[in-house]
Amino acid sequence: MLLPVFLAAAVVFGVLSTLETKQNALLAWNLSVMLASTNLLAFPMVCALPLKRIAARLAKSGSAVAGFSGADAIRRSNCVILTDGDLFPPGTVTLGGLKVFGEESGKVISYAATMAHASESGLSRLFDNLLASDGGFREQVEDVDFYEEGGVGGRIHGKTVLFGTAGFMRKRGVNLPRNLGLKTGVFLSVDGTLIAVFAVKYMPAENVDWALHALHHSRITPVLAVRDGNITPALLKRKFGTDARAVYPKLSTRLALSERGGGRPYALLMREGLMPYAEVVLGSKRLCASAKRCTVLAFLAATASTLLAFYLTFVGAYSVLTPFSLLIYVLLWSLSALVDALLSDRY
């Protein structure tokens, strides 16, 4: 937008310098000096070079952004919505043990897999794999309800089945074994009677650890749109050493955020986990910030160069304005924007 203004100013200044020197033969020379000073090399690369650098980094992490417009839309938000799979991708949630109380293990696994699948949480894949290895099948569940305390309930064959954390079970009046040392256990009850305890282990992934610390450092707030009652800011603090100042909204908000979709896509994630997601968010902010700084630097360089060239041509100091000196001057002014653009992918 500013480039046509500078070009028009260069033409006007070139004409004024020619009129002042009263040498019409120098009009073309004055115009060439003014135009060369105004059309700096930094203008074409203020957006293109940072975008190229950021896009190359995102490609290595398995993600891509929809150009500068997509990055601009992403950087406007200072929060990211994280689901179960973002924080604990497949393979990081494992079963450490199983204890059954008065029921067949096949029935227990079938009921647990059914409730985990109904909750659509990160536990569903774990229990689906457990069910497949046991050779069982999921039951039909009705009247599925989610509870703020960290669990889900439903009816299977007319019986009330609850599936969730220890705190959830106590809130629902289910008696649990004494001296229970499980911090991330999952419990299953039928008609108010505990029938199984699953020791679930959450292993921190290195890429998620890096992503959470990067989000914390960049002051981007994670919003936990999780369905697994065990995944809380306290769990993140234990596993990753930081909760990144995560927001843990009410259940209704978490469910709505986890189901939200269908909007205009601004980025593409080709790998699971939080790292490519965080790379897109951080990269978009870096891209927009670098493009803004480079634009300001190019604007200042063009302004200073135009005014200086106008002064030198106006006073007739043509011995200073050699092609070589003008080229060096333009390159030096463009260097600051070039360095900023080249460092845009360092974060």
Locate each region found by the language model:
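ATP-binding catalytic core of ATPases
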Residues: 1, 99-149
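Asp-based phosphoryl-transfer active-site loop
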Residues: 71-97
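Hydrophobic alpha-helical transmembrane segments
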Residues: 1-79, 227, 267-347
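Short beta->alpha transition motifs characteristic of CBS
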Residues: 90-97, 164-168, 198-202
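A short, polar/charged loop-to-alpha-helix boundary motif
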Residues: 96-108, 173-174, 205-214
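Conserved ATP-binding TGD loop and adjacent catalytic N/P-domain core of P-type ATPases
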Residues: 156-159, 191-330
